[in-house]
C-alpha cells in the first residue's frame, strides 16, 4: 500500500498539477477491478483508481488535462518469466484468459502512448487491458 498508493499520491500531488500538464496516466491493475491477487495489492490498486478519479476532476477543471488509469492483466516481461516457464501454471492461466495469451510489453507501451499522446477527451476512466481476465475473475489461478 505504501508503494502502490501512498507514494503514487505523493508524486502525483508534487508533479501533476502544473500549467503545462496535458495528461496523467496511472498504472493500476485488473486486480483493482476484480479484487484478485493479494488483498493488500488489490486494495492498493483499487485505491489508485479512486485517487485517479479525484485527480481527473481536479485536472480537468483546472488544466483541461486528461487523467486515466490502465488496468493491465498479465504482461510478458522478464519478471513474469517464472510464471510462463511453469508449464502447468501457464496452461491454467491461458485456460482462464479469454484471449489465451498475455500482453507483450510493446502492446502495453502502445496503450500508454495512446492514452498520453493521442487521447484528448477520455478522462476519469480505469481501462481494462487484460485480455478478458476481468471476465474470469472467479477463475483466478495464480
Residue ranges and their predicted role:
Residues 22-47, 52-61, 74-75:
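Catalytic loop of short-chain dehydrogenase/reductase
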Residues 74-96, 138-142:
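A glycine/serine/threonine-rich, flexible loop-to-helix segment
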Residues 12-13, 53:
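A short, exposed helix-loop element centered on a Lys and neighboring polar residues
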Residues 97-108:
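A conserved structural motif in NAD(P)-dependent oxidoreductases
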Residues 113, 120-142:
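Short C-terminal tail/terminal secondary-structure segment
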Residues 19-20, 59-64, 75, 103, ...:
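A short hydrophobic alpha-helix cap/turn motif
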Residues 49, 59-76, 122-129:
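Conserved Rossmann-fold SDR core element
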Amino acid at each position: 500500500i505504501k508503494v502502490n498508493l501512498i507514494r503514487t499520491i505523493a508524486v502525483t500531488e508534487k508533479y501533476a498539477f502544473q500549467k503545462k500538464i496535458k495528461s496523467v496516466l496511472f498504472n493500476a491493475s485488473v486486480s483493482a477491478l476484480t479484487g484478485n491477487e493479494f488483498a493488500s495489492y488489490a486494495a492498493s490498486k483499487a485505491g489508485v483508481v479512486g485517487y485517479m478519479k479525484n485527480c481527473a476532476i481536479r485536472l480537468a477543471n483546472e488544466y483541461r488535462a486528461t487523467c486515466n488509469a490502465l488496468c493491465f492483466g498479465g504482461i510478458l516481461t522478464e519478471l513474469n518469466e517464472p510464471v510462463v516457464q511453469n508449464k502447468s501454471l501457464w496452461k491454467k492461466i491461458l485456460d482462464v484468459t479469454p484471449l489465451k495469451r498475455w500482453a507483450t510489453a510493446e502492446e502495453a507501451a502502445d496503450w500508454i502512448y495512446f492514452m498520453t499522446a493521442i487521447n484528448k477527451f477520455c478522462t476519469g476512466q480505469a481501462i481494462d487491458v487484460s485480455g478478458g481476465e476481468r471476465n474470469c475473475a472467479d477463475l483466478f489461478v495464480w
